[in-house]
Amino acid sequence: MNAVSTIRRFGKLSRAVAVVAAAAAVAVGGPALTAAPAHAAPPLPAEFNLSLYTPVNPGPFQSLAYSDNGRTFFTTGRWNCQIGPKMRYVGCQGAPATAPAPTPDAKTLGAAITADQQGPWWVRTGFLYTPSYKFGPNSGFRPPLLRVGQSLTAAGVTCTVPRADEVACRTGGRALIFTPGWHKFYWPAWDSKGHSSNPAPQYLPPRLRGSSQLP
């Protein structure tokens, strides 16, 4: 075999080895190129999946009394909530077991979200102060019943009743869930101070122990 043939055969072998090596590199590196993002969006809690609820006409839930300032009210039988008077204002009255414990000087009245900019905050009262936030109609308006499986939307707020002892309200990036045994608050990722805290994870159902942000 002459030198030219040897060089040609060696060149073909080198190209074949290079092709095999490139294919192996793609096979090894392929999964890394298609891997899922490290920070996937949190799942939407069932409390805020509106496809599970029947919307109601908000008209009968809005008080026309001047003293109620256009607010919308409802009761679940266990919880009393109100929407308004401005866009994305909502509050629910009551204290789940994980709310701040009452003391001789203060007790928890409920929680509220303000214009989707602050909250949920606990609304508390005490011997030396009273909150500016007021629960319930000032008139004789009787809040209608929002039933299990229904949703109510008014003034940029949507509330649902997943179960007889549970209520959930969302303004956008903020939300609250009340049950007798626990509460869960949601707020935007950028907000580190404008809200009250959630209970320790062990007090929440497993499906809600993760993120405090909504998708």
Question: Which positions does each model-derived feature cover?
Answer:
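A low-complexity, Ser/Thr/Gly/Pro-enriched, surface-exposed linker/loop concept
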Residues: A41-S63, R88-L146, W182-P215
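Secretory targeting and sorting signals
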Residues: M1-A40
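Extracellular/lumenal glycan-associated surfaces
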Residues: T76-V90, A154-R174, Y203, S211-P215
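Extracellular glycan-recognition/adhesion modules and their associated mucin-like linkers
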Residues: A65-T76, V148-A154, T158
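Polybasic (Lys/Arg-rich)
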Residues: T179
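Acidic, glycine-rich flexible loop segments
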Residues: P131-R170
